[in-house]
Amino acid sequence: MLQVLLVTICLAVFPYQGSSIILESGNVNDYEVVYPQKLTALLKGAIQQPEQKYEDAMQYEFKVNGKPVVLHLEKNKGLFSEDYSETHYSPDGREITTNPPVEDHCYYHGHIQNDAHLTASISACNGLKGHFQLRGETYLIEPLKIPDSEAHAVYKYENVEKEDEGPKKCGVTQTNWKSDEPIKASQFILTPEQRAYMNANKYIKLAIVVDNVMFRKYTGNFTAIRTRIYEIVNTLNLIYTILNIHIALVFLEIWSKGDSINVQSVVDVTLNSFGEWRERDLLNRKRHDNAQLLTGINFNGDTIGFGFVGSMCIPKKSVGIVQDHSKTHLLVATTMAHELGHNLGINHDGDSCTCQANSCIMAAKLSHQPSYQFSDCSINELWMYLISHTPRCILNEPLTTDVVSPAVCGNYVVEEGEECDCGSLWYCRNPCCDAATCKLKPGAECGDGVCCYQCRFVTAGTVCRPARSECDIPEYCSGQSVECPMDHIQKNGKPCLMNHGYCYNGRCPIMIHQCIALWGPGTTVSSDVCFQRNESGQGYSYCRRENNQNIPCAPQDVKCGRLYCKFHNVNTLPCNFKYSDFAPDYGLVDHGTKCGDGKVCNSNRQCVDVNTAY
């Protein structure tokens, strides 16, 4: 609990009961008018920096249902990555990228006094705007647009008239990942490397893309769009705090000139297109772990979101799409939390899943009542996904090499002069780190990391990054550092999968696996006669494209062009293929794939001798 000095700014608190009013969240049937009284909360012994516009910690007192409450707030220092940037496009299509100053921002997390749970997500940019929980009920607060007045409206979420009474749902109908056995996390015995992975802090560097329809929905007002996104991510960050996953906004792109993909109301088409665009375009411009498309279009039916399951850190699939379906940012943030949960391997809740709320985050049908909580099933599935897949990208702390501002203790980033950083006094769960000083506690050798366990360096020789395949090489802790050594892989061209393939960049690419990835289980590679189509260069049958022209395959290269697959059911077409007008390489045989005895497909889609290919 914060030790604070209270400095009272005397503002009267006059509750007023209203019947109906139109606010930003919509038409509200019952509300109170309050005048929050600010109690400036200074950390004991700390001095507020004169150049800092927004304080690190604040308290406000006002009445709810005629009874006084105190709202404790602390700045969410982990909201933005240090290298946060924004991109939009001029009317003539020029890319405009900026690095706005976000260190002294106005977004806070907090709680109501005498309630230990962090359930408040508040913007203090112009008055208090956001939501909090009190005695299990969700309340919203926002300033009233009255000149020269400190008046705010406080109201229960249930008193907001529903924009659409129809049920809403997620588009995921089947999982792409499922644990081999329904083992409970508590029954699982971890290996040393799994234990090290689970003990390490998890960071998701999030990129959000706003499509052109949403840009026009907000009448091209960049400030309004930024505010909307910041409020959503502040709530998203709050929701994932309970899972010990820190979400930092690293990038915002606004398609102000036009969409970079064909955003359709068909969710699976849009999701696949967005994933392909992320892999070929966005990842080359901005390093991040996960991207979410926020769109103003209405998806088909009652679907408002869609995401790949168990796909975190996969270039083409660590994505989700979310419809901006409500005036209340809390509901949109809950939907984004749901789709991000799918990316983290969490499936929809079954009937037996429970949480301490009327609705849980991963319910298949999304409730009109917002939820801050994951069910017991969700927590177990996340745990199982992390220990079985160990997605590596979320172990990387936000870059410190790009930091140009002074070190900030409490933002989860270990910067110059710090030995550890576990967040604020409220958030810190690290027994090795002093949250007030960002220094290790006496006797601690380390704070966190895959090679740190119980504040001590892990024994030298402990596996910290197991081999992901026979084309990978395991790495071991040194016993003197928290870091796992640089990732190394087997030499390209080494035979793998019982000589069915050759190693390429740490993988063993073979055609049958690529067919299954494109078409699902029950598929295999088509006969050679199908691949001969690639000699024509017609339609989608080619080896590569240059200057918008199809380049046909030479006879010896046909198995390096379009990939043809067939289903085991003999009644289906024998030469099935996939393509995308937005990603010319989609559906082609992967580089490094075996195309004959002792031969592999090179980057120019030629079938060459494996001994000279690399």
Curated annotation (Swiss-Prot):
Glycosylation sites: 221, 534
Residue numbers binding Ca(2+) 1: 408, 411, 415, 418, 421
GO (cellular component) term, any one: extraorganismal space
Record motif Metal-binding, residues: 338-349
Placement of sequence motif Cys-switch: 167-173
Coiled-coil residue spans: none
E.C. numbers: 3.4.24.-
Disulfide bonding pattern of the chain: 313-393, 353-377, 355-360, 409-438, 420-433, 422-428, 432-455, 446-452, 451-477, 464-484, 471-503, 496-508, 515-565, 530-575, 543-553, 560-601, 595-607
Sequence positions bearing Pyrrolidone carboxylic acid (Glu): 193
Primary localization: secreted
CC cofactor: Zn(2+)
Active site: 339
Any one of the GO BP annotations: venom-mediated perturbation of biological process
Co-factor note (free text): Binds 1 zinc ion per subunit.
Function: Zinc metalloprotease that has fibrinogenolytic activity. Does not have hemorrhagic activity in rats. Cleaves insulin B chain at '38-Ala-|-Leu-39' and '40-Tyr-|-Leu-41' bonds. Hydrolyzes only partially and weakly isolated extracellular matrix (ECM) bovine fibronectin and basal membrane (BM) protein human collagen IV in vitro. Murine laminin is not hydrolyzed, neither isolated nor in a solubilized BM preparation. Nidogen is hydrolyzed at '350-Ser-|-Phe-351' bond in a solubilized BM preparation. Hydrolyzes plasma proteins involved in blood coagulation in vitro.
Name of the protein in its database record: Zinc metalloproteinase-disintegrin-like protein F1
Organism: Vipera ammodytes ammodytes (Western sand viper)
